[in-house]
Amino acid sequence: MEIASKYNPEEVESKWYNYWMEYGCFISVPDGRKPYTVVIPPPNVTGVLHMGHMLNNTIQDILVRRARMKGYNACWVPGTDHASIATEAKVVGRLAAQGISKQDLGREEFLRHAWDWTHEHGGIILEQLKRLGASCDWTRTAFTMDESRSESVIKVFVDLYNKGLIYRGIRVVNWDPKALTALSDEEVIYKETNGKLYYLRYFVENEPDKYIIVATTRPETIMGDTAVCVNPNDERYRWLRGKRVIVPTVGRAVPIIEDEYVDMEFGTGCLKVTPAHDVNDYMLGQKHRLESIDIFHDNGILNEHGGPYAGMDRFDVRKKIEQDLIDAGLMERVENYVNKVGYSERTDVPIEPKLSMQWFLQMESLAKPALDAVMNDEIKLHPAKFKNTYRHWMENVKDWCISRQLWWGHRIPAYYLPDGSIVVAETAEKAVELARKQTGSDSLTVEDLRQDSDSLDTWFSSWLWPISVFGDVMDPENEELDYYYPTSDLVTAPDILFFWVARMIMAGYEYRGKKPFDNVYLTGIVRDGQGRKMSKSLGNSPDPIMLMEKYGADGVRMGLMMAAPAGNDVLFDESLSEQGRNFCNKIWNAFRLVKGWQQAETSTQPEASALAVKWFGYRLDEVKTELDDLFSKYRLSEALTLVYKLFWDDFSSWYLEMVKPAYGQPMDAKTYGSTIGFFDQLLRLLHPFMPFITEELWHALEPRHDGETIMLCLLPDAHETDRDFLQAFDRTREIIAAIRNIRTGKNIPFKEKLTLEAGNEHDASFDAVIIKMGNLEAINRVEEKTSGSTSFLIGTLEYAIPMGALIDVGEEIKKLSDELAYQEKFLASVMKKLGNESFVAKAPQAVIELEQKKKSDAEARIATLRDSLNQLQSTK
């Protein structure tokens, strides 16, 4: 296979991805091997790739590819989420552009349009993931609303209802007045908003000269007030016990109640209680048995309880009521105030806490095993710092509002009988059977039943994802589930640790009796160089496809991972992708160099090459062991950095230079064979991170059969390494680096041969390497160094290079004198610090030891400099 002069990512990537697909390299079927299973966090079906997806799926692909190369039966299940609110909003928007409303169409016709939209846009993000190199088993692609997943969702709803865990009731929910649906907490984005704090006068009933002042940010909700609450420990309001106050503009008398929930320091210490429009007020209302008055229509317009403001929008009412309160003498004052207001993530309008009839799932009993599993490390979070966050959520779990006022989604399988009673069943036909038994009326038909119009929260399907992707959740004899479940690793973001991860754990224990995954790798947020979260609105998020076109998928993958420690935010800059591309070029050029060498079968292996081969073999084994350790701790960024340095520094900068034959000369076959073997191992270690270039070069190493691929090669095993040899070789590299520094500092060209003088303590084992890499004439053992030499220290051993006519003696004396003056000044500062009794008494022992080491190092350097100066001065 001929290797091109330049690396062309676009050509290489398309060629090898098509090859992997053609030969079914990603496909997994149950067999005798141990499975390694990952399920993709399903992106929105209508979404497109963004940098968060890039990070998440790069990490998954690294883990999956490495597992394959460890001999596991790796199965990465892809799929998409039907994303009820997002998709419905898109379809409603497209219809509105044609002058068509959702209501005009009716449910069935609207759903036809929604399916058309899904089929039209649904495959985009999955195709984009292929550009990234995602090695998913595409034959297993799942969709949360396909037939199999839908059947499982409905069966689970019915099962939980029959267990008494699902119920219908009135609660305060996050309401989107534009989408006209309840929202889950994670669909609410809190934004800092410049608003006002209104101080209102609530006059005491039958005491017209007395009033209390209540602070609120939402005066438009006072029509729903049913109490004013104070803290029982607040001495200021003891006189109000048992009294009632008049709600401003409304004229309704409401009781004063006492509860320690009230913060005495906020505002005036008096809280207006509006149970229908604040979740905390609702809890107070339940506790104190207060009336709940809902003053809003679903669209944010005030209803008949809004009094004179009925028919007005909530924000128009806020402006109008402010002036009305001032005119009535009921406004004490108004202050500017910054607070966090919840906005719908999908429609970007302020949400309305609203009392609403919804379906709920009781969570307390489901949460217990899910909490225990994480706290006892049956399921491990990486990094573990998120355990406390998880525990807080799970110990304070609330019932889950699972209904949405949407048409796109899994329709709730609840059916209303003519008398208003409810039956829950998987199908209308089964519902009729239940209804007949329940009522004793055999004349009931499907037409007599009315199915609930709400759909289930999208998360109600995705919480089953690790189970449902392998078939029927409720099937106890599901062979695929028995083999692939529990899955191995889940890669996701911390912001959905509760909303998705915790719920999957609950579902796993409820429906399989075991955890859904072993480990949860929590990624950070991708931010720009200024630390800002990447977003379309800020214009700071690069297009991943354009990045891959510019730098190649491997380059972008590497750039992301170099800056992606688990659980910490990723400060991404395009220069990281450039660094990744440069590394690809480095690998490519190193390969071309090696393959360009000629072999001589009969030549003897040089001593320097034999030492280099031995050293790099040990170094390679050392890195393999470190890699296994880093992967076991999910420190993937550090793992990549380790392999990067191994290739760039150890292999390219040192090993290849040590074994490189003289210009025009062939390389001995033994060294060449070892070098090709090392390259093969390096490509395997790099493959999980950089799949495309490694596949290309692996095929260029030697002829391959059709269907062969590096991804199905086993990773090389780590063998025992010789640490003493490696440490000795590190000292050898230090000697070579010092010789190079002297050449650079004194402008001595590399072609000029030098002589190195060493003491008797010098280990001569690696002299062949030092002579070659330093271009030395010889290494001589001496009792005293030659006059006019330049010396250097490696540890405590001194080395010298006779300069002779190679340098300007006067210039060298000046340079060494300046360095000596600096070192003497530095030593004086260290001695002053160590002579300070207060410092020595208070400083930690480690700090004192560091200063003492600085002292001894400076003293050794000064002695060497003085000796060198004496030698030079004696030659003048």
From Swiss-Prot:
GO terms for biological process: valyl-tRNA aminoacylation. Residues 844-876 form a coiled coil. A motif ('HIGH' region) lies at residues 43-53. One of its GO terms (molecular function) is valine-tRNA ligase activity. It catalyses: tRNA(Val) + L-valine + ATP = L-valyl-tRNA(Val) + AMP + diphosphate. It holds the Pfam family tRNA-synt_1. Keywords: Aminoacyl-tRNA synthetase, ATP-binding, Coiled coil, Cytoplasm, Ligase, Nucleotide-binding, Protein biosynthesis. ATP binds at K536. It is an enzyme of class 6 (ligase). A motif ('KMSKS' region) lies at residues 533-537. Signal peptide: none annotated. This is Valine--tRNA ligase. It comes from Porphyromonas gingivalis (strain ATCC BAA-308 / W83).
